[in-house]
């Protein structure tokens, strides 16, 4: 049986796309996924171009594939994702042993690209933007476990000054309303209990409703997803503060299936820097969203993205960022030093801050976030948390593990519960009393209701 190996870089959108690559090749050619690159007949790299480091990792990996290709001349090597969109045919120029190059919007054409490569002997490149076409050509999702990603829109139309996503994934295009609901319903029938709705700016969703001229916004989509039998939890990422409507805020007051956690990237806490980033909101407007949410959900868990060392960032700007991190009490983050991307306006900005200064700022920020994480975890000890059971614990298969609403992994014992009873709990929501907090997980015991 032929096999496909996929290496994924970057965001959850790429994770979703990688799963779809496997689904497409399985449906068309019977390929099964493998974690062993050496036994693969097709090797795909689903790439990210948000930071230079991630991009260079791809070419480093490709270099290692050259020797494997020499031993297995029929091996197919493909590069997809945002680096593929950005670099196109230059990838083949730099690595002639690459067989196919495809963008996020053309992954459904993989079988045809591979067949054309094998027929002509020429490397194939397709990085076009055929809007939402790919979703019409994808086979039904195959899922394992109680959680799944669902892409509801593609692209970005915000054009932040530092970001390449609009150039690599195209403008915002929303999937039709009924198509999203049908995919979620299909997942629920396979046992999925938690869905994460995905988009570069997921709350900018505007989906066409059937044959009418009506458009569904993101809040309406969530309301309908919440009504699908079997779906117990709803997450989404990544949201944009500029698109966080009052309708979406109000939904947190009446939709229990929306988890008590939100990833809302702020990037910075200096209005001057936010303006240079072209983010489209002020610090006050961002804080206002969180204040309104915490009126409805006082213990709402927040996470964010942060960029330090943006051109022109002063010590005073950075202190504003640190103050906001303390004020809001973020629970985890994705934080990075500014990485100038070719073709973006920010790449041309004057930057006179030494790298050592940027590195110290990043280390301080990450240390503060880690302190927040540990404090929040410790405060969960003694509480009862609702856990979605994902399967056996990795270190002790006699126990189970699952996740809290704020994404903490919880390993828990089941005293007196036979193995058959444990197996039946996978995919269920259970109450667990938290007894211990560790750096990256929690421990507890299931609460047995009499």
UniProtKB/Swiss-Prot annotation:
Keywords: 4Fe-4S, Cytoplasm, Iron, Iron-sulfur, Metal-binding, S-adenosyl-L-methionine, Transferase, tRNA processing. It catalyses: N(6)-dimethylallyladenosine(37) in tRNA + (sulfur carrier)-SH + AH2 + 2 S-adenosyl-L-methionine = 2-methylsulfanyl-N(6)-dimethylallyladenosine(37) in tRNA + (sulfur carrier)-H + 5'-deoxyadenosine + L-methionine + A + S-adenosyl-L-homocysteine + 2 H(+). GO terms for molecular function: 4 iron, 4 sulfur cluster binding; metal ion binding; N6-isopentenyladenosine methylthiotransferase activity. It is an enzyme of class 2 (transferase). It comes from the Bacteria. The keyword Transferase applies. Residues 378-448 form the TRAM domain. Its EC number is 2.8.4.3. Coiled coil: none annotated. Its cofactor is [4Fe-4S] cluster. Residues 142-375 form the Radical SAM core domain. It is found in: Cytoplasm. It holds the Pfam family TRAM. Binds 2 [4Fe-4S] clusters. One cluster is coordinated with 3 cysteines and an exchangeable S-adenosyl-L-methionine. Catalyzes the methylthiolation of N6-(dimethylallyl)adenosine (i(6)A), leading to the formation of 2-methylthio-N6-(dimethylallyl)adenosine (ms(2)i(6)A) at position 37 in tRNAs that read codons beginning with uridine. This is tRNA-2-methylthio-N(6)-dimethylallyladenosine synthase.
């Amino acid at each position: 049986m032929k096999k496909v190996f996929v290496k994924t870089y970057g965001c959850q959108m790429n994770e979703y796309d990688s799963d779809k690559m496997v689904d497409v090749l399985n449906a068309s050619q019977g390929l099964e996924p493998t974690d062993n690159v050496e036994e693969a007949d097709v090797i795909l790299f689903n790439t990210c171009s948000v930071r230079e480091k991630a991009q260079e990792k791809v070419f480093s990996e490709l270099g290692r594939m050259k020797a494997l290709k020499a031993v297995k001349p029929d091996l197919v090597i493909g590069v997809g994702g945002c680096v593929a969109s950005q670099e196109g045919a230059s990838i083949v120029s730099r690595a002639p042993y690459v067989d196919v190059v495809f963008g996020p919007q053309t992954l459904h054409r993989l079988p045809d690209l591979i067949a054309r490569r094998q027929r002509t002997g020429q490397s194939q490149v397709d990085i076009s933007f055929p809007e939402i076409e790919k979703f019409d050509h994808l086979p039904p999702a195959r899922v394992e476990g109680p959680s799944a990603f669902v892409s509801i829109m593609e692209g970005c139309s915000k054009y932040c000054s530092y970001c390449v996503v609009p150039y690599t994934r195209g403008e915002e295009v929303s999937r039709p309303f009924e198509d999203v609901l049908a995919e979620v319903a299909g997942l629920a029938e396979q046992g999925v209990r938690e869905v994460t709705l995905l988009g570069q700016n997921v709350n900018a969703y505007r989906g066409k409703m059937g044959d009418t001229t009506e458009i569904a916004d993101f809040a309406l989509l969530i309301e309908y997803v919440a009504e699908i039998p079997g779906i117990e939890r709803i997450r989404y990422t990544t949201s944009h503060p500029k698109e966080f409507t009052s309708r979406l805020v109000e939904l947190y007051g009446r939709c229990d299936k929306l988890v008590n956690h939100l990833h809302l990237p702020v990037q910075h806490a200096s209005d001057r820097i936010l303006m240079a980033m072209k983010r489209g909101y002020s610090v006050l407007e961002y804080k206002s969203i969180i204040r309104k949410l915490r009126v409805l959900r006082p213990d709402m868990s927040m996470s964010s993205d942060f960029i330090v060392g943006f051109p022109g960032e002063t010590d005073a700007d950075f202190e504003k960022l640190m103050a906001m991190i303390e004020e809001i009490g973020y629970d985890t983050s994705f934080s990075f030093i500014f990485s100038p991307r070719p073709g973006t306006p920010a790449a041309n900005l004057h930057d006179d801050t030494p790298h050592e200064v940027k590195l110290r700022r990043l280390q301080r920020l990450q240390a503060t976030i880690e302190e927040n994480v540990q404090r929040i975890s410790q405060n969960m000890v003694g509480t009862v948390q609702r856990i979605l059971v994902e399967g056996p614990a990795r270190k002790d298969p006699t126990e189970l593990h699952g996740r809290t609403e704020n994404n903490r992994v919880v390993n828990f014992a089941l005293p007196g519960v036979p193995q058959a009873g444990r197996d039946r709990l996978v995919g269920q929501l259970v109450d667990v009393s938290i007894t211990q907090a560790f750096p990256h997980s929690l421990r507890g015991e299931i609460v047995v209701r009499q």
